[in-house]
Design a protein with these regions (language model features):
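Acidic, Ser/Thr/Pro-enriched low-complexity segments and adjacent helix/loop capping patches
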Residues: 1-138
């Protein structure tokens, strides 16, 4: 059975979401500051802290109507390709972090938010990459 919906996982006040469509992971989100798109783009050397702060101010002025990624591209702070790489890295990092959890709670809701970005994430490649990362840290 290929499910569509949102898997919500929580642990020690942190909440992470994994979004599925027809059994495939299409996106992930998190309340962890380190999982934010801007922080990931900075970590990947695709964005400066100054440009991130400017884009966040623009986002506040738009009352959240414009997504951060769109503002970053519109203002020339990142290329569409770098944004795509950042989004995929964000999803991979969030899911990787879940493999490190030793406890927590979860629930699945057969509903996707209408405003999420939907990427194509190859689950087999993702799991292989996560196993390699875990082995490297061991």
């Amino acid at each position: 059975m290929k499910v569509t919906g949102t898997l919500t996982l929580s642990n020690r006040g942190m909440v992470k979401y994994v979004y599925f469509k027809a059994g495939e992971i299409v996106f992930a989100a998190s309340t962890d500051v380190n999982d934010r798109l801007g922080e990931i783009l900075i970590k990947c050397c695709k964005l400066s802290r100054e440009h991130l702060e400017h884009a966040l101010q623009l986002s506040k002025r738009s009352a959240g109507l414009k997504k951060l990624g769109a503002l970053l591209v519109e203002n020339g702070f990142v290329t569409p390709k770098d944004l795509f790489i950042g989004l995929k890295t964000q999803v991979k990092d969030i899911i990787y972090s879940l493999f490190l959890w030793t406890d927590g709670d979860y629930r699945f809701e057969e509903k996707l938010p209408s405003d999420i970005i939907q990427l194509q994430i190859n689950i087999k490649e993702l799991i292989t990459e996560i196993i390699q990362r875990i082995k490297q840290q061991a």
